[in-house]
């Protein structure tokens, strides 16, 4: 697991993700034509109360992967 630093609108964020999740997080940002900071900020707004952002990012990536597999 590696800690990554992001920024958006003057705010700094850090997130620790395994290499595979980081790669998929970057792919999500690319697919949505967003910076990593924009994607993090967008996900932060929808993070369930009591959840961590790391968990929310992993869950979002997992749900996206499942949806794509079902659509294929």
Locations of regions flagged by a protein language model:
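Short Lys/Arg-rich basic patches
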Residues: 1-16
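Short acidic, gly/pro-rich beta-turn/loop elements at beta-sheet edges
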Residues: 16, 25, 69
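Alpha-helical membrane-protein topology signature
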Residues: 6-9, 27, 56-58
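C-terminal structural segments of small proteins and small subunits
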Residues: 48-72
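A generic structural signal for ordered secondary structure
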Residues: 13, 17, 34, 40, ...
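Generic ordered-secondary-structure signal
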Residues: 8, 20, 45, 51-53
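Surface-exposed, Lys/Arg-rich phosphate-binding patches that contact polyanionic backbones
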Residues: 20-38, 42-45
């Amino acid at each position: 697991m590696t800690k990554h630093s992001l920024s958006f609108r003057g705010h700094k964020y850090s997130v620790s993700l395994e290499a595979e999740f980081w790669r998929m997080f970057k792919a999500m940002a690319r697919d949505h034509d967003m910076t990593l900071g924009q994607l993090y900020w967008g996900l932060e707004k929808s993070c369930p109360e009591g959840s961590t952002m790391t968990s929310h990012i992993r869950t979002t990536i997992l749900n996206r992967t499942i949806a794509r597999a079902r659509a294929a």
